[in-house]
Amino acid sequence: MAGAVDYITKPLSAPITLLRVRTQLALVNQRRALEDQIHERTEELHETRLQLIRGLARAMEYREGGITQRVLRVSEYVQLLSEALGLKGKVCELLSRAAPLYGVGKMGVPEHILTKAEALNDREWTEMRKHPEIGAQIIGEHKDPLLGQARIMALTHHERWDGTGYPAKLKGEAIPVPGRIMAVADAFEAMTSTQRHRSPISAMGAAKKIAADSGKQFDPKIVSAFMKVVKQFDEVRARHKDELEGIHDLDFGAPAKK
């Protein structure tokens, strides 16, 4: 009998039957305990992986001149956008957790370019535009869904809907959805946070600029979803200002608060 570890024959004996039942219950309990241990170890490995992602994101920010809450904000922006697009809950969570690594390729860009106070010149922009491919190389190719989505975001978040982006000049639907989502999230973050060569603008000001680039830089469907959650984006921005206090206790994989 497939899967059988014991069986009872007739005529039935009460003591033997009781012993066999007890044996089967013990086996069931052992199996459940083993399953619980496997689940616990899986959760521990998952948390370790998230901690490594957060640590790498922090290292990237240190190199750019100090820790901010940018990757936390962007993670929540991605969560909000994914939900507004109607993606499944697990997919939204996956993309949000993968988001901190989207700019990891900047670790391969010369430090004097990353920390330059003035606008970059053409030669420096050429170096800066290498960071999506560098990021994809750093993350590598994995079967793991989280790292796979992180690689896609890192590689494609500077592609443009009209095909004039970089590094591959992908156009329209050829750009993976995670990259299209991150393009909007990253643009909003860049416009509403303090930059070395420009001051931040308001959430509504950023929304107007993003809407103006719908169909050019950004996927119109994602822009439409973004416009529905601009208020929530602004709440995230206000809630996670760039303050050093408590930054090490932040959960970069937490779902966006509404």
Q: What feature does the model see in each segment?
A:
Residues 1-32, 241:
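N-terminal membrane insertion elements
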Residues 2, 31, 45, 182-185:
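Residue-level recognition of hydrophobic positions within alpha-helical transmembrane segments
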Residues 9, 42, 192:
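Ser/Thr-centric signal marking residues that sit
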Residues 19, 24-54, 58, 62-65:
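Amphipathic alpha-helical coiled-coil "transmission" helices that mediate dimerization
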Residues 57, 61-258:
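Metal-dependent catalytic cores of enzymes that make or break cyclic nucleotides
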